[in-house]
């Protein structure tokens, strides 16, 4: 991904969509999604955003495969961001919590030093400036651009018969819009000159720590 101000904004939008998609779709009331998952034996409903993927996950009982597929495909097809403003508070809270964690501040500084101008140099949740300027229209556009079938993958693990499950999944998830997500420009990592040393200072007394970073094999 090319790291620009637009890319930072996209990362923020994805985080906000995560929070909203857990709670709403066209045919349910706020928080009803979680109750539906629980009703059909599900638990652990959550979402996560990393530098390279967005993941929605939960556990559920195999006998409710039909209901699970219907519910989870629906939120990828007909989400309604009616809780946009209230759910921003959840994102703000997470941003503040992360900012209070000393290790997180140090890691952000190190990532910015060793990965700039690559996207890995920027916090996933975005900057405070980004979070203070939300636009619902941008969120809708992000969803339309990136939530297409060719940009998704479904992973199931557990005790079930794959031959019986495939028709259920195809019926539910084939309703997701087809299309291709926007092509992203590749950004090369800056050269790593072997041993580099940097010091990070924060106004916290009596705490000293050392971290070691290694350039791994490219994905």
Which ranges hold each PLM region?
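M16/insulysin-pitrilysin zinc metalloprotease superfamily fold
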Residues: 1, 59-88
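Extracytoplasmic/secreted cell-surface and envelope-processing proteins
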Residues: 162-166
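Non-catalytic beta-strand/loop surface segments
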Residues: 1-63, 85, 95-151, 175-219
